Amino acid sequence: TGVSPISSIRYAGSPWELRLAEAQETLRRNGLRERVRLQTDGGLKTGLDVIKATLLGADSFGFGTVPMMALGCKYLRICHLNTCATGVATQEPRLRAQHFKGLPERVIAYFTYLVEDVRRHLAALGARSLEDLIGRADLLVEREDVPHRQQLLDLSRLKASASLPGAASHRAAPPIAAPPSPLAQQLLDEAFPELKAGRSVRREVRIDTQDRSLGAGLAGALAKAFG
């Protein structure tokens, strides 16, 4: 994140390509891949990044930094101080009023161009959708226009999962959904009809740690109803 030490940003963790390929191979070897949705994030920027992640086994993708930059983030790494100079990562009304210039249309434009880029790569590969390419690591080709030292790297393990016979390469089984808590179900039953009818709803309830996801079910129902 923007508040991480620079040493952590540069050196901590592993490239998502390596861990994604490893997770894909392990799940397929154990016959569990069809039960799991694999999501990857961290440095995804272009349609080609999405295609590569798909070929390595990703079902979905997370974007954080680039949409924030589309809203005006300058990556000043002071998010935790509540003094963001662009008004993006602050709750200070004065800073937001004076400096925040972000528009949702900019984020929409970014993802629109991203999707168009993905579509061009899909057409070049002769695929109709990303689902056709999930786990198709055999389609990855190593570049030859790289320095000699990089040519010495053995990247064959990145493609190992594609050669496993008979194992599912992406999620096929429906997700396992935990039943909502009684309070969450009560909120859904009481608030959803009112919100669907265009009326505002106000409720005061006592919650504890068992209701950490309170409101998620209602948000999902609204998303299904209104998109």
How would you label these PLM feature ranges?
Residues 9-16, 43, 74-77, 97-112, ...:
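Hydrophobic alpha-helical scaffolding
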Residues 127-182:
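Terminal amphipathic helices with adjacent charged low-complexity linkers/tails
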Residues 57-60, 64-147:
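Mobile "lid/hinge" segments at catalytic clefts and subdomain interfaces of large enzymes
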Residues 1-28, 163-227:
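Non-catalytic terminal/interface segments that mediate subunit docking, oligomerization
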Residues 41, 49, 59, 117, ...:
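Acidic-enriched, low-complexity/disordered segments with a strong bias for Aspartate over Glutamate
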Residues 1-98, 215, 219-220, 225-227:
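Glycine-rich phosphate/ribose-binding loops and adjacent secondary-structure elements
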Residues 81, 115, 127-131, 152-155, ...:
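Alpha-helix initiation and N-capping motif
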